[in-house]
Regions:
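Positively charged n-region of N-terminal signal peptides that target proteins for export
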Residues: 1-4
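A charged, solvent-exposed segment within the mature domains of Sec-exported extracytoplasmic proteins
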Residues: 132-187
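An anionic, turn-rich surface loop/hairpin at beta-sheet edges
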Residues: 94-106
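Hydrophobic membrane-insertion alpha-helices, especially the h-region
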Residues: 6-23
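Acidic/polar low-complexity surface segments
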Residues: 8, 14, 99-102, 258-264
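Hydrophobic loop/turn residues within beta-sheet-rich immunoglobulin-like superfamily modules
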Residues: 62, 80, 117, 136, ...
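Short linear S-[DN]-x-LW-Φ motif typified by the pepsin-like aspartic protease active-site region
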Residues: 26-91, 105-125, 130-144, 151-154, ...
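Short, surface-exposed interaction patches in beta-rich subdomains
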Residues: 162-163, 172-284
C-alpha cells in the first residue's frame, strides 16, 4: 500500500512538472515584447481617446503627435474624423487567476506625445497601473477609472476648460493645473491638488478618504464634500477675496488662516463651500 502511494505521488509530481514547463513555455511565446511607434500630422488631430489595460500611460508635450508603446499587448491606433483612438487590447485572459508565470516581466508603457495646441476632446480610461498627463491644453476632458483596479492618476501643468473624472479606487492628484467646470468624484480614493487653480467645480469623495488641497490659487472657487474623511486646504499666498461656507455635520471646522474674519476676506466673490459627515474641515 505504501509503495503504491509513493508511486502515485511520483507520477503526480512528474506530470505536474511537465505540465508546468509546457504551460510556461506556451506563455513565454504568448508574452513576447511588442513595440510600436506611429506619428501623425499635427493639423489632422483635434482629440484623443485612450483605452488602456494595465500600461503606465504617459501623455506629454512634444513637437509632433506620436504614439509609442512597449509591452505584451496589441495596440490599435486609428485616426477617425480628427480623433486619435488608441486602444490597448487584451491578448488572452487568465480565467484561473494564475498570475505567477515568471516570464511575465515586461512592464507595459504607453507614451502619447501632443504638440502645443488646444485639443477639443480628451478621453482616457484604464484598469490599473499609473497615468501621468502633462501640459495638456483641452476644452473637454473625461477621465474614467471606474474599474476595481487601482490607477494612480496625475494631471500636471495642464489647462482644462471642462473636466469629468470618475475613480472608484483610483486617487487623483492635480499639480500646477488650471481647471474649470470640473466634476471630480472618487468612491474609495483620495483627491489631491497642489498649486492649482480650480474654478466652478465640484470635488466629491463618498467614503472615508480625504481631500487635500495644498498651496491653492487664491482665486479658486468650488464645492467639496467628503462623507467620512477630512477636507484640508491651504493657499499659495494671502487670500484677498474669499467667502468660506464650511458645513461639517459631526466633525469640526477650523480656520487657522489669519486673513479671514468671520470666514470672509474682502468682498467674498470666490466662494468655497465644503461639507463633511464625520470628517473635519481645515483652512490653513
Amino acid at each position: 500500500m505504501k509503495k503504491l502511494f509513493i508511486s502515485g505521488l511520483i507520477i503526480f509530481v512528474v506530470c505536474f512538472v511537465l505540465a508546468s514547463v509546457m504551460w510556461f513555455g506556451f506563455e513565454r511565446q504568448n508574452n513576447k515584447l511588442n513595440t510600436a511607434h506611429k506619428s501623425f500630422p499635427n493639423d489632422k488631430i483635434n482629440g484623443l481617446h485612450i483605452s488602456s489595460q494595465n500600461s503606465f500611460v504617459e501623455v506629454k508635450r512634444g513637437k509632433q503627435f506620436s504614439v509609442s508603446y512597449k509591452g505584451q499587448k496589441k495596440l490599435n491606433v486609428q485616426n477617425h474624423n480628427g480623433t486619435l483612438y488608441i486602444k490597448e487590447q487584451r491578448n488572452s485572459e487568465d480565467h484561473y487567476g494564475l498570475n505567477f508565470n515568471p516570464f511575465r516581466k515586461i512592464k507595459e508603457h504607453l507614451v502619447v506625445t501632443v504638440p502645443d495646441k488646444k485639443l477639443k476632446q480628451f478621453d482616457l480610461k484604464s484598469k490599473r497601473n499609473r497615468v501621468e498627463v502633462n501640459q495638456l491644453d483641452v476644452e473637454k476632458a473625461k477621465i474614467n477609472m471606474a474599474y476595481e483596479g487601482i490607477v494612480k492618476v496625475g494631471l500636471n501643468r495642464s489647462n482644462v476648460d471642462k473636466l469629468f473624472y470618475r475613480g472608484k479606487n483610483s486617487p487623483v492628484t492635480l499639480t500646477k493645473d488650471k481647471i474649470a467646470n470640473a466634476n471630480i468624484k472618487s468612491s474609495n480614493a483620495h483627491i489631491n491638488a497642489e498649486e492649482s487653480l480650480i474654478e466652478k467645480s465640484v470635488l466629491l469623495v463618498t467614503r472615508d478618504k480625504d481631500i487635500h488641497l495644498d498651496k491653492m490659487d487664491i482665486n479658486s472657487n468650488f464645492k467639496a464634500s467628503s462623507e467620512n474623511g477630512d477636507i484640508i486646504m491651504s493657499y499659495n499666498r494671502k487670500p484677498e477675496n474669499v467667502l468660506l461656507k464650511l458645513n461639517p455635520s459631526d466633525g469640526k471646522s477650523k480656520v487657522f488662516n489669519s486673513s479671514f474674519n468671520d470666514d470672509k476676506v474682502g468682498k467674498g466673490d470666490n466662494v468655497l463651500e465644503m461639507y463633511t459627515e464625520k470628517g473635519n474641515i481645515q483652512i490653513n
